From Swiss-Prot:
HAMAP family from the UniProt entry: Adenine_deamin
Record-level Gene Ontology MF annotations: adenine deaminase activity
Entry similarity comment: Belongs to the metallo-dependent hydrolases superfamily. Adenine deaminase family.
Swiss-Prot/TrEMBL cofactor(s): Mn(2+)
Alphabetical GO biological process terms: adenine catabolic process
Reactions the enzyme catalyzes: adenine + H2O + H(+) = hypoxanthine + NH4(+)
Lineage of the organism: Archaea, Methanobacteriati, Methanobacteriota, Methanomada group, Methanococci
Protein's recorded name: Adenine deaminase
């Protein structure tokens, strides 16, 4: 037995800090002493007792990330856990729709079972494919949902991104929702900018949460209508400012802090960084509640410093900067846990998750755009305008003459999406504003179907990048002046790898090589959302440009 003596317990049940002592036996909390009776209790215990005097340090439950896509870290779960445990996260709720779009059910089962210490819970992907406006590698049907929904650690139906299908009562979409209801499971939402009658209609079908709010009015309306509000602060989307709504309401129980997507280079200490940012709006205790008791109440977990609960907690030296003294995971100190994980042999990756880039090699001519590079025509052209720290894009309109000038200045880039699952030969072609100042980038990580996305203005560099990407089995490529500048192989589904240390080193080298190429801090993650048609306003898939959930022509 280990007794943590003289600690300040962060009581997430009451929002207090309470002086006390906590005893741990194996992986459980055996008792919590709030009456300073620890010495008397120890005397009665016949077994060996190790006493650790924390000298007033804070004891908090470990954290829950209630909405994250592990694939965005580019690590398989057994590598991902080595990073997030160091951040005090012991439970994650994932929606593995990235790998599901590539490998279907087999991909979901791999994500569910690969981690060894981290508790991984799954919300089953509801929208695979996300829409019929792109080509996916797999489909998850209502029948598939019913096959999987009663598995251990499956909590319900993942973010229902195709909200128009819900509002318009699409039969297949409603079947999936009904399966979740049938088994009393949770249903996560995803409804950017939805309000009023449409939001009510969406909620009426059983949607319980949302993480897509972009302004305070939107967040407040969703919260007031009964949705659990997930406020995300990740690598691509940074919405922590929405906590400003806490000045207008009196009850924060239905607010959670989540990450959604975190790149590996931001993964170390990511949840601690979220908490630090949150204290600009709420107290440290309230912030901790938003990553412990609040998500626990939604997902049905039992957390908190309580007898019988899992002995997983973070020991803080202070709450001003959330400086960590140590972390205990299931009764063991973090270093011991990490040593065990590092000694474990790697599991074999299922064959279906490997060698997933099935398109033919491309030539320079594949990266010419009709009406601009050949068979020129006058007119007005749609251009995607990306927004920093947001998944939302805007539509800009330029004349053909303006486009030519801006292309020459690299103020506008060409953007392509190459279908990679079924060798259809599809290439979506478009233009994007003010993203890449030099070189060409190509990636097989592109939401949600994860076709290959490429951006640049030099056809030779674009072809080189896309072909090299096929050779390495997927990942990230940067090319310039006819040479591959740097690359990161991600052979698992073309979106993940199985060596965290190597990937961390390689991605840092990649970003160092392309420094100054883009004004976007994380261009590969940012460009991965340019192909996500369920997010407004103008996106691109392998089938072409998408606006308002409809395919539109490049020329107006």
């Amino acid at each position: 037995m280990i007794v943590f003596k003289n600690t300040k317990i962060i009581d997430v049940y009451t929002g207090e800090v309470v002086k006390g002592n906590v005893a741990v036996e194996r992986d459980k909390i055996s008792f919590v002493d709030l009456n300073d009776e620890i010495d008397k209790i120890i005397e009665k215990i016949k077994e060996d007792v190790k006493v650790i005097d924390l000298k007033g340090k804070y004891l908090s439950p470990t954290f829950i990330d209630g909405h994250i896509h592990i694939e965005s870290s580019h690590l398989i779960p057994s590598e991902f856990e080595k990073f997030v445990l160091k951040s005090g996260v012991s439970k994650v709720v994932i929606d593995p729709h990235e790998i599901a779009n590539i490998a279907g059910k087999e991909g979901i089962l791999f994500m569910l079972n690969d981690a060894k210490i981290l508790d991984v819970y799954v919300m089953l992907p509801s929208c695979v494919p996300a829409t019929n406006l792109e080509t996916s590698g797999a489909e998850i049907t209502a029948e598939n949902i019913e096959e999987l929904i009663l598995l251990d650690n499956v909590l319900g139906l993942g973010e229902v991104m195709n909200y128009p299908a819900v509002i318009n009562e699409d039969e297949e979409m409603l079947k999936k929702i009904e399966v979740a209801k049938k088994y009393n499971k949770l249903i996560d939402g995803h409804c950017p900018k939805l309000k009023g009658w449409e939001l009510n209609k969406y909620i009426s079908h059983g949607i319980m949460s949302d993480h897509e709010s972009v302004d305070e009015d939107e967040a407040l309306e969703k919260l007031r209508l009964g949705l659990k509000l997930m406020i995300r602060e990740g690598t691509a989307s940074k919405n922590i400012y929405l906590l400003n709504i806490c000045k207008k309401i009196k009850d924060f129980r239905n607010i959670m802090l989540v990450s959604d997507d975190v790149c590996i280079k931001d993964l170390d200490g990511y949840m601690l960084n979220i908490l630090r940012k949150a204290t600009n709006y709420v107290s440290p205790i309230e912030a901790i509640q938003m990553v412990t008791i609040n998500p626990a109440n939604y997902f049905g977990f039992d957390v908190g410093i309580k007898a019988g609960n899992e002995a997983s907690f973070v020991i803080f030296e202070d709450l001003d900067n959330f400086k960590v003294y140590n972390i205990v995971i299931k009764g063991r100190f973090l270093d011991d846990v990490l040593n065990e994980l590092n000694k474990n042999k790697k599991r074999k990756i299922p064959e279906k998750l490997m060698n997933t880039l099935k398109y033919q090699y491309k030539n320079e001519g594949d990266f010419l755009i009709k009406g601009i590079d050949y068979k020129e025509r006058d007119g007005f052209i749609r251009v995607i305008k990306p927004l920093k720290d947001s998944l939302i894009t805007e539509e800009l309109i330029f004349s053909t003459e303006e486009i030519k000038i801006l292309l020459n200045e690299n103020a506008i880039n060409k953007i392509f999406v190459i279908e990679r699952h079924k060798n259809t030969g599809n290439i979506g072609k478009g233009l994007i504003y003010n993203f890449l100042e030099e070189g060409a980038l190509a990636s097989s990580y592109a939401h949600d179907s994860h076709n290959v996305i490429a951006i640049g203005n030099n056809e030779k560099d674009l072809a080189l990048a896309v072909n090299k990407l096929k050779d390495i089995g997927g990942g990230f490529i940067a090319a310039k002046d006819g040479e591959v500048v740097e690359y990161l192989p991600l052979p698992v589904g073309g979106i993940m790898g199985d060596d965290g240390k190597y990937i961390a080193e390689k991605i840092n080298a990649l970003y160092k090589k392309i420094e100054g190429w883009s004004s976007f801090e994380n261009p590969f993650l940012s460009m991965s959302f340019f192909s996500l048609p369920v997010i407004p306003e103008l996106k691109i898939t392998d089938k072409g440009l998408v606006k308002d959930m409809q395919l539109v022509d490049l020329f107006i």
